[in-house]
């Protein structure tokens, strides 16, 4: 199984890019991981929120491959502790045949088409974070889950 992360828009801040790359490199010791960045929609000032979600949704769905298991990072999704998330990933490693793909949506969330294509929704917190920050936090949580599953001394209860 591979893990994929689809995000909308590039990461601008160098310190986030550096930290994201650090955790992406660490993850490669445990599981194949890829992050796909969908470019920001151009001329968003001329679009309604719904139109922007639709355009982003089309690009998200286009990035999927046959057999992908789609999980949305959504404020209304199921919340996990780090230990619970590691168990969740372990189960998915045994049941998802190809790619487990997580998606961070755009500023207004997901289109109905993306919600319909998704198998699950998970939430990292009831708080709101910037899209750039959530990428780092989520990749770190995947790394943390891998260290938990391998009984390595990274996570402390």
Swiss-Prot record:
GO molecular function ontology, one term from the record: rRNA (pseudouridine-N3-)-methyltransferase activity
Cellular component terms per the entry's GO annotation: cytoplasm
Keywords noted in UniProt: Cytoplasm, Methyltransferase, rRNA processing, S-adenosyl-L-methionine, Transferase
Binding residues annotated for S-adenosyl-L-methionine, in chain numbering: 73, 105, 124-129
Record InterPro entries: Alpha/beta_knot_MTases (IPR029028), RlmH-like (IPR003742), tRNA_m1G_MTases_N (IPR029026)
One Pfam family recorded for the sequence: SPOUT_MTase
Keyword Thylakoid: no
Range of residues in the leader sequence: none
Subcellular location: Cytoplasm
E.C. number(s) listed in UniProt: 2.1.1.177
CDD domains (alphabetical): RlmH-like
Record field: catalytic activity: pseudouridine(1915) in 23S rRNA + S-adenosyl-L-methionine = N(3)-methylpseudouridine(1915) in 23S rRNA + S-adenosyl-L-homocysteine + H(+)
Keyword Transmembrane helix tagged: no
Broad enzyme group: transferase
Protein family according to the UniProt entry: Belongs to the RNA methyltransferase RlmH family.
Subunit composition and interactions: Homodimer.
Stated role: Specifically methylates the pseudouridine at position 1915 (m3Psi1915) in 23S rRNA.
HAMAP family: 23SrRNA_methyltr_H
Protein name: Ribosomal RNA large subunit methyltransferase H
Organism this protein belongs to: Parabacteroides distasonis (strain ATCC 8503 / DSM 20701 / CIP 104284 / JCM 5825 / NCTC 11152)
């Amino acid at each position: 199984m591979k893990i994929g992360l689809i995000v909308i828009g590039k990461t601008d801040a160098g310190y986030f890019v550096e930290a994201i790359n650090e955790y992406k490199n660490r993850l490669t010791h445990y599981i194949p991981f890829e992050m796909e960045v969908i470019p920001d929609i151009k001329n968003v000032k001329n679009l309604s929120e719904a139109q922007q979600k639709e355009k982003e949704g089309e690009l998200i769905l286009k990035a999927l491959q046959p057999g992908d298991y789609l999980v949305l990072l959504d404020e209304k999704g199921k919340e996990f502790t780090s230990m619970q998330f590691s168990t969740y990933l372990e189960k998915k490693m045994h049941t998802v045949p190809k790619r487990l793909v997580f998606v961070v949506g755009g500023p207004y969330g997901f289109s109905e088409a993306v919600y319909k294509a998704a198998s699950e929704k998970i939430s990292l917190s009831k708080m709101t974070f910037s899209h750039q920050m959530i990428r780092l936090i989520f990749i770190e949580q995947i790394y943390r889950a891998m260290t938990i599953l391998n009984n390595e001394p990274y996570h402390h209860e």
